Amino acid sequence: MTLQTTVADHFALRWRASSWLYDLTLILSGSLFIALCAQIAVPLPFSLVPITGQTFAVLLVGALYGSRRGAATIVAYLAEGACGLPFFAEGSGGMIALLGPTGGYLMGFVAAAYLTGWLAERGWDRNVLSTTVAMVLGNAAIYITGLAWLSRFVGTDQVLALGFYPFVPGAIVKITLAAMILPTAWKFLKR
């Protein structure tokens, strides 16, 4: 499979952007975008983990930026939140968020952004079906680490009921939205 450009690469080539400055700008703006989307939260009374716009932003940044920039953006986002900035869901921040029940989901963001970026670099963000598959795989990376970590807090008998099933409807909406946005963006850029 041939490597293709990501949306971020498309603009870098068009603007002849200085590599390090362009990357730094993308990483910082991407981490702020994720922080803003994380504040879109729907707390669930029966779960320790809210439904947020965070995962949508993580997967979108990964696909738009590519594997390396996407993962670097997530690392920056996690570092900003770990330092105490209110960047995580519902304005939380600090190491307690990374070490608490949601910590595994947060750590899974790195793999999710890298994976969706890697797939986008191979053209998986060009049509609705392949974008949907890429987003499902990215979500799987988040859930694998998130559920494994959450099981330390709630026990393996409750982990799916508290950390997976309630979030499937929200994940479907976010995946559908991304599957519409990315191919449309590419059609617009090809003009």
Where would I find each of the regions flagged by the language model?
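Helix-loop junctions at the membrane-solvent interface of multi-pass transporters
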Residues: L36, I40, L64, E90-G91, ...
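Short helix-perturbing small/polar motifs within transmembrane alpha-helices
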Residues: T2-R16, Y22, L36, M95-I142
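Structural signal for the C-terminal ends of transmembrane alpha-helices
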Residues: L64-R68, L115-G123, A185-L189
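Membrane-embedded alpha-helical hairpins and interfacial helices in multi-pass inner-membrane proteins
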Residues: G123-R191
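Alpha-helical transmembrane segments in multi-pass membrane proteins
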Residues: L26-C37, V58, G62, T73-G81, ...
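Alpha-helical transmembrane segments and their cytosolic interface
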Residues: M1-S31, L162-R191
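Hydrophobic transmembrane alpha-helices
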Residues: T2-A71
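Alpha-helical membrane segments and adjacent membrane-interface helices in multi-pass membrane proteins
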Residues: I40-Y114
